[in-house]
């Protein structure tokens, strides 16, 4: 004989049983909500490698449409003052004496250069934060996605990676970055060609996996001091084979070659500790 059981009305349950039932129901609901949020974030696991060279934007080296006319560049749309600064940096670069702190592990890479490094990356996604982790350095860009805003202007200051807050539009992460160091006074350059930004830089990035399976980050850079128009740059990353690893890489451990503070030359040191090139004699 089958027995049928009707649910017991809440008013007939002992008070202790009612409280336990409510707590259990709340816990189940919270777990379901957390699972739904977790399921809503994309799977960006694995190891990724940047595509292309370490020039931040190839259009800074070529003319419109890829033209290679000497002295003609499409980007960046610098103001006259920053165009002069960039030309001065390129002149130093051509002599091999560009003072780039990142080339000798002097400071953290910073943003947006953190998206322009030759080694591999991991993209860690949680409902509250997204981390862009570069093997090189290592360097980390933290993006808050928990609904918070930037700190008030009085409560923030320039840093290497700035302050980033973001939100999801489907599978696309949209994040806003402010409070970046200027590229002057020994701070990080945007790339090895001498590209620069000011402390007024404001970057809006859109990050997603495109139809070709590449991680794509499109950055729109506004800088009222350095740029006369928005500067749009896109970087792409390819997922590596399953099982690829991010290795322990401490840049400073390999920083054994001194830099001449007068000329900017980096000396090459041999096994016996002596300089083995003629950099110091070059002008």
Tell where the protein language model's regions lie, with residue ranges.
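Compositionally biased low-complexity segments enriched in histidine and/or tyrosine
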Residues: 7-9, 207
